[in-house]
From Swiss-Prot:
SUBUNIT field: Monomer. Homodimer. Interacts with protein B119L. Interacts with membrane protein E248R.
Lineage: Viruses, Varidnaviria, Bamfordvirae, Nucleocytoviricota, Pokkesviricetes
GO molecular function annotations of the record: metal ion binding
Protein name as it appears in the record: Protein A151R
Record's keyword terms, sorted: Early protein, Metal-binding, Zinc
GTP-binding listed as a keyword: no
Its biological purpose: May participate in a redox cascade for the formation of disulfide bonds in viral proteins.
Cofactor: Zn(2+)
Amino acid sequence: MALSYKEKLIECIDNELQNGGTLLLLTNNNVVSEISYYGNGYKYFTFNTNHDLISQEELKGATSNNIARMIYNWIMKNPQNNKIWNGEPQTRIYFENNVYHTNYNHECIKDFWEVSTKVGPCIFNDRSIWCTKCTTFYPFSNILSPNMLE
């Protein structure tokens, strides 16, 4: 039986967490929180819009699947404004309901560019976007140049 959109997205987030690295949660293109794996568990950080640390806590007993479900619920609260950017190994970014997919054209490309320039340089290398319509990742490397956004 095919996985639902919700199950697919939770599975993808879960896989990213299991592969180590950092998940940055963005609202209106500002990083508002971060979940990172530190050897024996996960830590959760929250930030203000200037990226100043507000708080941090250890997520004791949390599993990657628990966290993936928490993130999914966080996205669903306000899907038009929430995004997830995966840090090291920095391979994927997820866009929610405001994305559509037609012949490998994504409306979110311009938005992705704006987010990526805030998060770090050269983010177009080895990246992919989660497409809400085809429920799969579209490799960003197929896009010829950021100049297409101008």
